[in-house]
């Protein structure tokens, strides 16, 4: 009896193939099916289990036995096309339903050699996704301008205008009346050219200063704008307020996509050797029951035939 599980385990290693994948959303129903290659043998039993150690069901024809708290309300079983295909449907998917599902066929030859048992195994990976793949895009697309002011009375806005060149994809426009400066941003420093004196200065860490909010429009994540004149400095800082964005766009119902590698806590820890041995024992019990039934039927029918023969004589 101990040789049968070892034989079935070796056969399962031979038939091992890369697992195909199917992807569904939370709340949907997922139908997983597999078909056997050996169509000449008779299927004694089929089984479904989930890695690593969770047996879902054992099925012999229309009789289905569930394990590990699985029920037909959660997982329904079907075996159409004369046991050529076995199918399960997982209803109302949750994140815990994701993982690798394995189906197995236990087959015997149609000849009198009932000791030979063939075994085929196939695996399918189920991925459960959420509905919030675009959440990060929504958060990154918004920006909230935040401004403060320093020494506005020292700024001379007469007869000058400002033109800004920024290395970010979208330009920043500052509508300060009648002054002209050119500011070029690099990665960590800001170069400012003074229109009145022609001198160039570099600010390593600019102070967060701003003009009036209604006088300019900023559409960027983080940017600094510095205008240097003869009498003062004005700097505009535009940042993205993460707290406000999460208040606006964050939804408790939307969660980043989740892919579960496939682990399920079960009441008992099963190994491949254990359930293969269970399958073998069950197969022998079924075959023994069939043999007992045939012997009983033969004995019961033998006596009436003998009685009829004696009456004829």
Curated annotation (Swiss-Prot):
Gene3D superfamilies registered for this protein in UniProt: Immunoglobulins
GO annotations of cellular component type: host cell membrane; membrane; viral envelope; virion membrane
Recorded topology in the membrane: Single-pass type I membrane protein
PROSITE patterns named among the record's database cross-references: IG_LIKE
Matches recorded under SMART domains: IG
Function in brief: Prevents cell to cell fusion by interacting with and directing the viral OPG040 protein on the host plasma membrane. The OPG185-OPG040 complex associates with components of the entry fusion complex (EFC) presumably to avoid superinfection and syncytium formation. Via its interaction with C3/VCP protein, protects the infected cell and probably also the extracellular enveloped virus from complement attack.
Subunit note: Heterodimerizes with OPG040. The heterodimer OPG185-OPG040 interacts with components of the entry fusion complex OPG143 and OPG094. Heterodimer with C3/VPC protein; disulfide-linked.
Protein name, as recorded: Protein OPG185
Originating organism: Monkeypox virus
Gene name of this polypeptide: OPG185
């Amino acid at each position: 009896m101990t040789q049968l599980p070892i034989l079935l385990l070796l056969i399962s290693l031979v038939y091992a193939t890369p697992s195909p994948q199917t992807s569904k959303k939370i709340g949907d129903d997922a139908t997983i099916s597999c078909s056997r290659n050996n169509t000449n043998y008779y299927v004694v039993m089929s089984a479904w289990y989930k890695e690593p150690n969770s047996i879902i069901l054992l099925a012999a024809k229309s009789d289905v036995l569930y394990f590990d708290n699985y029920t037909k309300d959660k997982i329904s079983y079907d075996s159409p096309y004369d046991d050529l295909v076995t199918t399960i449907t997982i209803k109302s998917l949750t994140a815990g339903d994701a993982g690798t599902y394995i189906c197995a066929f236990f087959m015997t030859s149609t000849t009198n050699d009932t000791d030979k048992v063939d075994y085929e195994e196939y695996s399918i990976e189920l991925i459960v996704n959420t509905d919030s793949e675009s959440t990060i895009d929504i958060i990154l697309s918004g920006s909230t301008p935040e401004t403060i002011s320093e020494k506005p009375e020292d700024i001379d806005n007469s007869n000058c205008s400002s033109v800004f060149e920024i290395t970010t994809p979208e330009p920043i426009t500052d509508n300060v009346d009648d002054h002209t400066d050119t500011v070029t941003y690099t990665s960590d420093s800001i170069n400012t050219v003074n229109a009145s004196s022609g001198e160039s200065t570099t600010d390593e860490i600019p102070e967060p200063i701003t003009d009036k909010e209604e006088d300019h429009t900023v559409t960027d994540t983080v940017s600094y704008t510095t205008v240097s004149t003869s009498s003062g400095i004005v700097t505009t800082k535009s940042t993205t307020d993460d707290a406000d964005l999460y208040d606006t766009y964050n939804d408790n119902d939307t969660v980043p996509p989740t892919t579960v590698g496939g682990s399920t806590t079960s009441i008992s820890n099963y190994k491949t050797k254990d359930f293969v041995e269970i399958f073998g024992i069950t197969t022998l019990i079924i075959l023994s029951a069939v043999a007992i039934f045939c012997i009983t039927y033969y004995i019961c029918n033998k006596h009436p035939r003998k009685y009829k023969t004696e009456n004829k004589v």
